[in-house]
Amino acid sequence: DLHSLRRRQRQMCIRDRLLHSRMQDEELDFYTEDCQRINRWKFFLAQEHSLGKGWDLNYGAIYTTSIDNSYQYYYDPETGEQLTSSDALSNMKSRRREQTWNIYAGFSKSFGDKLALDASLAVEHYKTPVWNQWDWYPIVNLNYMPSPGHILQLSLSSDKDYPDYWAVQDAVSYIGGGYSELHGNPLLKPAQEYELKMTYILKSKYIFSAWFNHTKDYSVQTLYQSSERLVEIYKTLNFDYQQQAGIQASIPFKVKNWLNSRLTLIGLWHREKDGDFWDIPFDRKQCYGIAQMNNTFTLSTKPDLKLTVTGFVHSKAIQGIYDLPTSGNVNIALRYGFAKNKAILNLYCNDIFETGQISPRIRFKTQNVTNHYSCFREFGVSFTYKFGGYKEKQREAVDTSRFK
């Protein structure tokens, strides 16, 4: 039996964010103070049994609860007094509780040396001041090895992606001189992803995959130009769903002892649908491709000198009502190892041709947005030295993915 309690607390406060702005007949003159404090507890029980004849059983329960104490206040920059809602600015103070119960059970079974199966099913209850729902999450993995070096894998997986804590607060922030507003969304719910995937490994090095996934309530921050005011609104919304079907091939190759390369090719069909996206619902589809190549050239073994060249290209894609242009980059690095390989000197240049940063745009119904973001070539040097046989202790990292 494993009984555990984990408690996490995080607090982050930002003070004195000042804005003076006049746009048409509207004037914004304030500074803000906002703070996020999260108290989170996690309890879990887990048990495993070996039943013999290749059968193993596991089950358990996980309970997670968090309390989000956050606020955002507006102040007069001259008097320092707190502004009220009558000043067209909304102060926000929240005490939001979230609870999740997850109960699961699974098994694994080996059928000789060629076939192995593991499966599990989790039922989860998610409760917030807005949502109270039950969901099911199945996982099935089947591995078949007809001969050494050849492996066929079939898998059904499922997962949940929770929104950031600050994204569900009923708060409004201003950027771009007040023309751009960042809106919270108290109605956000977790996204649920289900994926079916098949992978074939040939000669222990060539990898071929095909998959289909469906993400219900997929969420992402989107941009909308208001039809009522001269502002653009950034807000994280739940779409009806996102779907992807894809194929992938990963092919390594070597040229004697001086070149070691890997080419990865990906083809995707992508769909996103939202029937209540403001006043402009959408159902968009796009096919695109990705190619990536990693090359390591051994210039010399004595001294140990290697040159690494990597390249990446991504054809046109979509995200919500955004159109994402073609992008790519080429990186290069020169590595020198010495002192019996305890010391490594690395010189590198990233995004040589300054093509890595995309400038997404919107041309959809009433929306017309053009962005231009600059690309920068990066040069750097790093030095690493290993003292004796020191190995860094493995520690579980604190999950801060949902914090502001």
Region locations from a protein language model:
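Single conserved hydrophobic/aromatic residue that forms the stacking wall/gate
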Residues: 1-16
